[in-house]
Amino acid sequence: MITDADVRSFAELSGDHNPIHVNPEYAATTPFGRTIAHGMLTLSRASGMSINHPPMRTIAVVEIRSVKFCAPVFPGDVLRVRTTVLNKERRGRGKRGLVTWRRDVVNQDDKVVQTGESVTMVEAREPAEKI
């Protein structure tokens, strides 16, 4: 769950103190009617939720190809991530690989709030010569 404390902590960490995130009185005057989480907080949370799903050893994030913020995330929202593998490519004599992912972040109402595509370098499950 995204909490008010998460949003405040992210504002401190990132330096993004936009009042839409941290000032309830200001946020009440916006079309959202209340504070919303930073888009990058949602992206970071999605990354954390995805790290072991599916289980593999991630070496590095290589590229974030796209991110779309589809709907606001409010404090109190419960998020989950739907992950789809779009492409796999062997690298490093088969010891590593690049995986292209699509990740959809969905709230408790099954509404997609964020979507994106990224590439990670992962350790191969088996060396290429055994496949």
Residue positions per predicted region:
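Hydrophobic beta-strand-centered segment that forms part of the acyl-chain substrate-binding groove
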Residues: A28-A37, L41-N87
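Catalytic strand-loop segment that frames the active site of acyl-thioester-processing enzymes
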Residues: M1-A37, A124
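HotDog/MaoC-like acyl-thioester-processing domains
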Residues: V73-V78, R82-I131
